[in-house]
């Protein structure tokens, strides 16, 4: 099996897990996987996770953000491209729009997840813009996760499993901060 086929299979499995954990809804949120130094795969734009298939995952070139095929990549692919370009140690990215994080992102204050990890809040920019991608990429110079002001959360990790686990933990901790029992 080729690396592209393996990547499609793995990313598809984790995209379904991401949806099942309610960290994303409908077409909101996205997930990607670095294939090699030149390319990554990402979920498509405008396609509900319930309708997703491995063939709909989009291959994107890291150097310039160009994509291959007829299906458009997530509208936040600019953000993923900049993170992969600047952080060679990151192999997977999860961007969530989960309930508790949505609330906390509107407060625009950094917070602690677990006992040690602090996630900053990026400067506000409209979604799907180059400015949002630049603001998030700037925070990724020092952090592996960022709360996107009035938007959601994005985390980069060595694997899809690690990125999904961090995103899940962050949503739980956000609930604790909001006083959920």
Residue ranges of model-derived segments:
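Glycine-rich flexible loops
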Residues: 1-181
């Amino acid at each position: 099996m080729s690396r592209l086929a393996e990547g499609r299979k793995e990313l598809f499995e984790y995209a379904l897990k991401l949806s099942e954990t309610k960290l994303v809804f409908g077409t909101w949120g996205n997930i990607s996987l670095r294939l090699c130094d030149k390319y990554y795969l990402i979920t498509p734009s405008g396609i509900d996770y319930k309708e997703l298939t491995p063939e709909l995952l989009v291959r994107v070139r890291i150097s310039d953000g160009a994509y291959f095929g007829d299906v458009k990549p997530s509208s936040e692919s600019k953000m993923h491209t900049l993170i992969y370009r600047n952080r060679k140690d990151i192999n997977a990215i999860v961007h969530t729009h989960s309930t508790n994080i949505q609330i906390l992102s509107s407060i625009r204050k950094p917070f602690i997840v677990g006992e040690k990890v602090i996630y900053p809040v990026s400067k506000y920019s409209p979604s799907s813009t180059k400015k949002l991608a630049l603001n998030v990429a700037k925070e990724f110079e020092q952090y592996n996760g960022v709360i996107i002001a009035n938007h959601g959360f994005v985390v980069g990790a060595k694997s899809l499993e690690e990125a999904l686990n961090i995103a899940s933990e962050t949503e739980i901790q956000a609930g604790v901060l909001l006083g959920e029992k």
